[in-house]
Amino acid sequence: MKASELHQKDQAALNKELSDLLKAQFGLRMQLATQQLTNTSQLKKVRRDIARVRTVLTEKANQK
């Protein structure tokens, strides 16, 4: 997800997106631990998406 798309969302939508990404990250970590994950680059993508969402949330909080 691009940062420009995240800037257009409100804080509630960003929190939901963050929650979904954290659940996805947990699932991927479990798959990695049980050696079921074949595409390990998904972990990196999800981790970076989480960082993007948290950055936008912080920016919105500091604007107020």
From Swiss-Prot:
It comes from Paraburkholderia xenovorans (strain LB400). Keywords: Ribonucleoprotein, Ribosomal protein. HAMAP family: Ribosomal_uL29. One of its GO terms (cellular component) is cytosolic large ribosomal subunit. This is Large ribosomal subunit protein uL29. It holds the Pfam family Ribosomal_L29. NCBIfam families: L29. GO terms for molecular function: structural constituent of ribosome.
